[in-house]
């Protein structure tokens, strides 16, 4: 298979991810809320966002880096349109990746929280996922600036993210 064919497959997969979950997006719009990607676009300088692990879909979080007034920042936004933004192992992995990059580079972090808590179907693994995110956020405290916005229900363990 050629590189162009591989690229075509990746681009097709990316578009499929952007196009899927129209029901969840419509639900967000009806409640007067923006999607995770819209929120990130409102925060960051135009065209500066570089998404991390985009092809790992159904995670319920959009994460990456960009700039605010020309200054670098890492950002993650929980996506309420995907399983009500519930935290699971995949979502935590994307968040932790961004937090680690921020720690290594000394770059500020902006967290946009909008979650109905843990993914109950994952059982203890979902709580472990929260613990991993909390531990990384606590390690960043006093090391890099962090701003957390509560943009939705944020129940249970999700409410603690704003305090870290």
Locate the predicted segments by residue:
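Terminal-region recognition feature
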Residues: 1-147, 153, 158-160, 164
């Amino acid at each position: 298979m050629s590189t162009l064919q591989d690229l075509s497959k990746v681009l097709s997969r990316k578009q499929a991810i952007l196009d899927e979950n129209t029901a969840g997006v419509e639900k967000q719009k009806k409640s007067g809320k923006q999607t995770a990607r819209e929120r990130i676009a409102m925060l960051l300088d135009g065209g500066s966002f570089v998404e991390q692990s985009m092809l790992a879909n159904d995670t319920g979080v959009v994460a990456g880096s960009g700039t605010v007034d020309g200054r670098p920042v890492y950002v993650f936004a929980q996506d309420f349109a995907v399983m009500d933004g519930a935290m699971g192992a995949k979502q935590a992995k994307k968040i932790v990746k961004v937090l680690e990059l921020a720690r290594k580079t000394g770059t500020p972090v902006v967290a946009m929280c909008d979650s109905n808590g843990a993914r109950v179907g994952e059982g203890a693994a979902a709580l472990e996922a929260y613990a991993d995110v909390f531990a990384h956020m606590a390690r960043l405290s006093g090391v890099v600036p962090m701003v957390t916005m509560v943009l939705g229900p944020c129940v249970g363990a999700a409410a603690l993210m704003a305090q870290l």
